[in-house]
């Protein structure tokens, strides 16, 4: 397999730096571009400076140039930025790995439509462990569909800007689909004041923000006389970066299509 020419969006951020480190360490990948936001004080710096390495790739805000030089773009940024990058990727036939969260349903529809022209993987969480957890939740939801209250509790660092997390929503969507519903039909986001008794048909969400928590997710199936908890905890962002590279390798075999990590891992 020839070396994958990969560009990283949000290259100066926490996740972007982890992705750059992963690409530089991968024997089958080459860092082809490092995209940062317009106005960043780090524009023009070498993308490997934070590692004490010279990559020869400078941080830039020129998405057209980045897409002209790369075959793959890995994007963990924000919805508006990702959609702008998507337009450029479509023009240059660049394959996309998208880990951005916080998309609206119409924005997600744009991503799905793009799969008719280019190959892309979109997942709120690229971790192999999280995606295996989704299969466990699918099985558990069918067994506990009656007589168990379902709550999803997630915790992240103080800098995270969206809530609930994309992973928590993905968990809720998995559970809802396994029980013949849509998440919009049954989700309850936080509780406050006099709420009355719990509606047993709902899926509750609670979000915690604090410190440097990378990402903790627990799904609670609470019955009478017992409760079952399925938990995934991320100790670092390494698992996300490795999952993103795995997604890029998967896309090497596809010219077009909209995929997620369940496809990448063969869990369908």
From Swiss-Prot:
Cell compartment(s), UniProt: Cytoplasm
Taxon lineage: Bacteria, Pseudomonadati, Pseudomonadota, Betaproteobacteria, Burkholderiales
Active-site annotation: 156, 160
Positions contributing to NADP(+) binding: 37
PROSITE patterns referenced in this protein's UniProt entry, alphabetically: DAPB
Entry binding sites for NAD(+): 10-15, 36, 99-101, 123-126
Residues annotated for (S)-2,3,4,5-tetrahydrodipicolinate binding in this entry: 157, 166-167
GO biological process, one term: diaminopimelate biosynthetic process
InterPro entries named in the record: DapB_C, DapB_N, DapB_N_CS, DHDPR_bac, NAD(P)-bd_dom_sf
Name of the gene: dapB
Function as written in the Swiss-Prot or TrEMBL entry: Catalyzes the conversion of 4-hydroxy-tetrahydrodipicolinate (HTPA) to tetrahydrodipicolinate.
Family to which this protein belongs: Belongs to the DapB family.
Keywords of the record: Amino-acid biosynthesis, Cytoplasm, Diaminopimelate biosynthesis, Lysine biosynthesis, NAD, NADP, Oxidoreductase
Name of the protein in question: 4-hydroxy-tetrahydrodipicolinate reductase
Entry EC number(s): 1.17.1.8
The protein's annotated pathway: Amino-acid biosynthesis; L-lysine biosynthesis via DAP pathway; (S)-tetrahydrodipicolinate from L-aspartate: step 4/4
Reactions catalysed according to its record: (S)-2,3,4,5-tetrahydrodipicolinate + NAD(+) + H2O = (2S,4S)-4-hydroxy-2,3,4,5-tetrahydrodipicolinate + NADH + H(+); (S)-2,3,4,5-tetrahydrodipicolinate + NADP(+) + H2O = (2S,4S)-4-hydroxy-2,3,4,5-tetrahydrodipicolinate + NADPH + H(+)
Coiled coil: none
MF terms in GO: 4-hydroxy-tetrahydrodipicolinate reductase; NAD binding; NADP binding; oxidoreductase activity, acting on CH or CH2 groups, NAD or NADP as acceptor
CC terms in the record's Gene Ontology section: cytosol
């Amino acid at each position: 397999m020839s070396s994958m020419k990969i560009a990283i969006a949000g290259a100066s951020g926490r996740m972007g730096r982890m992705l750059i480190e992963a690409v530089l360490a991968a024997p089958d990948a080459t860092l082809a571009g490092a995209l940062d936001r317009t106005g960043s004080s780090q524009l023009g710096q070498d993308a490997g400076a934070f590692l004490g390495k010279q990559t020869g790739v400078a941080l830039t805000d020129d998405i057209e140039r980045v897409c002209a030089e790369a075959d793959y773009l890995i994007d963990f940024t924000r919805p508006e930025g990702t959609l702008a990058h998507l337009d450029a990727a479509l023009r240059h036939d660049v394959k996309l790995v998208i880990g951005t969260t916080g998309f609206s349903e119409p924005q997600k529809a744009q991503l799905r439509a793009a799969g008719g022209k280019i190959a892309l993987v979109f997942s709120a969480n690229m971790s192999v462990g999280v995606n295996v957890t989704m299969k466990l939740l699918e099985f558990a939801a069918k067994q506990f569909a009656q007589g168990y209250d379902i709550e999803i509790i997630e915790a992240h660092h103080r800098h995270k800007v969206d809530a609930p997390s994309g992973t928590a929503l993905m968990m809720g969507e998995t559970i809802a689909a396994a029980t013949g519903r849509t998440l919009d039909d049954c989700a309850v986001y936080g509780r406050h004041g006099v709420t009355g008794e719990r509606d047993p048909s709902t899926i509750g969400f609670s979000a915690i923000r604090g410190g440097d928590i990378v990402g903790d997710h627990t799904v609670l199936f609470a019955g009478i006389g017992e409760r079952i908890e399925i938990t995934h905890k991320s100790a670092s962002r390494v698992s996300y970066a490795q999952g993103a590279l795995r997604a890029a390798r998967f896309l090497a075999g596809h010219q077009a299509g909209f995929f997620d990590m369940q496809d990448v891992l063969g869990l369908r």
